[in-house]
Amino acid sequence: MSASINRWGMLAAHVCINFVLGGVYAFSYFKTPLMAQCHWDPATLALAFSINMGIIPLPMIWGGRMIDNGKGKQAIVIGGILFSLGFILSGFVDNLPMLFLTYGVIAGLGSGLAFTGNLNNILKFFPDRRGLASGIVLAGVGVGTLLCTRLAEYFMAQTHDVSRALLYLGIVYLVVIFIVQFFIRSAPAKDSGGIKASPLDKDYRHMLKDLRFWLLFMILALGVFSGMVISSSSAQIGMTQYGLLSGALVVILVSIFNSIGRLFWGGLTDKLGGYNTLVIVYLFTCLCMLLLFFFNGNTSVFYFSALGVGFAYAGILVIFPGLTSQNFGMRNQGLNYGFMYFGFAVGAVIAPYVTSAIAKYTGSYNTVFILTTVLLLIGVVLTLITKKYVATVLAKIH
C-alpha cells in the first residue's frame, strides 16, 4: 500500500459508513409501532427483516468483484444510496408486500453491497492487524444501531407516525453517505501489485470445492441464528416475557454491548486465534440462553443475558472475515467473503421467523432458548473439528 495513505483516517471514514448500515438492526424498535399502526401479524412482519438479511449475500458477490478490481469506494457509495432509498420508500408503503420490496429487497441489496465494500476495502489496508481493523469497523454497526434507534425515537416523538420516521431516517442516511464518501479511497486491485500473492490464495470456484469452506459456512450459520434471536426480537422478548414496559432501552443497550464486543473480540482474536475465540463466544452465548430459560420473568437476568448475547454475537461477525482470508488468502477476499456470508444469511433468514413463530404458537420464547443452545453446542463441536482439520491442510500448503 502507498505510504501516503493515512489508513487510520480511512478507518474512521469506514466506521462512519457503518453508523448508517447499523440502522438495519433498529428494525426491532420499529416492529411494535408498525404492528400497532398497520395491524400486521408479528411473524409475517418479521419476514421483512428476514428478506433483508437473506438478500444481503447476493450483492456481496457483485461487491466482492468490485473490491477485488479496485472499485471498493464505488461499491460503498452505490450500496449506501440503495440502502437509504429503501428506508425512504418504506415511508410511503401501506402494505406488507411493498415493505418486503422496499425494506427487504432494496435496503437489503444496498446493505450487502455497502457492507462488503466497507469491510473488505479497509481490511486490505490492514493486512497486519485484520482482527483489530475488522473489530473497529464493525463496532460502527453496533454504534449505528444505537444512534439510529435514538433517531427513530426522536422522529417518532415528533411525528407520531412510523412512516414519516422511516422517511426521515432514510434522508439522514443519504446525507451521511454523501459526506463521508469524500474521505474514502479504494484499495488497489488484486492484479495491480498492491496485494502480494500467497500460496493460500484461492478463487471462489476452488474455495467452494474445499471442505474448509463448508465447515466454516455451517459454523457461521449456527452462530448467527443465536445472535439474530436477540437482534431481531429483544424488545418483544423483554416486553412479553420479562415485564418490560418498553423495548427501546434494551435495543439501545444491546447495541452498545455489541459495539464493545466488536472491539474486544477483534483484539482477542489477534491474540488467541479465530477458532479458540469462537469457542469462547459460543459457550458464553450458551450460558446466556440457559439463564434466559431457567430465570423466566427475572428482569435483571434478562438484561444480563440479552446484553451478553449482543456482546458475544459481535465476535462472530469480527472473526469470520479473518478466518476466510486465513484459509483462502487476501487476493480474492472480497468475492470469497461474499460467498462465505451466505452462511450469515441462512441464520439471519431463519432466526427471526422461527423466533416469532415459536413464540406465537407456544406463548413463550423458552423453546427458542433451548433450540439455540443446542445449535451453539453443535457449533462448538464443529469449530474444534475444523481447527484440527485446517491445521493439517495448512501444514501441507506451507
Task: Indicate where each model-derived feature is located.
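C-terminal transmembrane helical hairpin of 12-TM major facilitator-type secondary transporters
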Residues: I252-N258, L263-F264, T269-L323
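Hydrophobic core of transmembrane alpha-helices in multi-pass small-molecule transporters
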Residues: M98-G112, V301-A314
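Intracellular juxtamembrane helix-capping segments at the cytosolic ends
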Residues: L34, L113-F126, S134, G315-F328
